[in-house]
Amino acid sequence: MKNSKIRILSLSIEHLKNVQHGSFDFQQDVLPAKAFDQSSVIGFYGQNGSGKTTVIQALGLFKQIAMGQPLWTDMEKCINLDSNKATISIKFLIKFDDGKSYHVLYSGTIAKRATYKVGCAFAAEKLSVASEVAGKISGRMTNLFSYELNFDDKPNFTPKARYDSIVKGQEKKIQASVAMRISQEKKTSLLFSPDFFALLKDSEETEMIEIVQAINSYANFNLFTITGVHSGLISMDAVIPLSVKYRHKDATAIGDIPIGQQGPITVNEQIFDLTESVLASMADVLGALVPGLSIEPMIYGRELMNDGSMGVRYELVSVRQDKRLPIRYESEGVRKILSVLNLIIAMYNNDSFCVAIDELDAGVFEVLLGDLLKVIMESGKGQLVFTSHNLRPLEILDKQNIVFTTTNPENRYIHLKNIRPTNNLRDCYIRALNIGGQDEPLATETKFHLIRRALRNSGVKDG
């Protein structure tokens, strides 16, 4: 498998949750040839329920699709009520180590139909590609491979010549039919399913093999999403999901390490060693973000676990001026930073790494948030996508790095227009909220007298 670097260039969402249609570019003013030369930061702002979180969830959904994992168990309920299908389209720049570069557009349509015993499944997928030469696209994007189910749930593959090349012979046609049926039953993508990829690898479609492998590897190792579930676990004092991508003992650890908040926990020695190493790797950055603070494990001893292996009983403590305090007594902001810091470090140092964080500002001091984003913008390498309500980043980031949600479900994401370099984006946003002047309304107007009356009447009802 060739080594590759990947950057997300754009994302389009249709009929997912409360977004009928919304699209945006990740790097508006950056030439494709220079896409890997600097970080890409994009923040989403808007009123509650306007589609900010849907962006993070759409990226998380694509990650599951490209990893060959099943769709969400409640996927049918996430399709907009006014439609029977949802589509996400995501465009990449893929650069291989042999010098070849491509623009690749993946589009997946998920439909709910009465004929699906599983409630919903993929109705269509398409992979389009265009070669990049000297930083420019050479010609239009062409259909690399696609299929669409007809009314009888039978797939129509295009281009037919490529499909015939992949499934030469009756035996492979049967294997392809089985792969399609399995992907429908398991609610997985056909393009990224192990069964279909086994057929693909046995074909002569080298270009398609390399592109599918690159996207699958990117989804597995370099694309991460942090949703409100993480923040909820922290807020409930349940666990701190320590999200990591970390090289440890000749292997790469990927996922969430659960850190107990209710007192000491016992984990096997391998998990403890990994946790200790991750904390040590973050120590300098954490101390720079929160001066005087360090986090370390306090070991209470070792004991035999149920499976017969040796475990370590420990809990995390925060240390300030040689005084130790259980991590559950630290502020929610510190615990939130601890949870995502390893991924932020990975994103800062890896130009093919993307992390999307919902409510990045939750519990975080606004000056610290602004300083962190400024450093990432100036000297980072990867991609950061975040949602926020704190307006401090509007004074730090350029206008092209901020996307605002609208009240129009048919056009959810826009950039503010008529913004000059000397304008304060924060002031312009507040002005647009109050008096308009943009292509779409940014928020539904709230009336003070109605709020006042509702509060008063509710108080009367409650005695």
Regions found by a protein language model. Give the residues of each.
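Switch/communication elements of ASCE P-loop NTPase nucleotide-binding domains
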Residues: 1-69, 73, 308-454, 460
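Short beta-strand micro-motifs enriched in acidic
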Residues: 27, 107-121, 300-305
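Short polybasic amphipathic segments
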Residues: 11, 88-90, 119-132, 312-320, ...
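Short, surface-exposed beta-strand/loop "edge" segments at domain boundaries and coil↔beta transitions
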Residues: 19-20, 96-104, 128-142, 305, ...
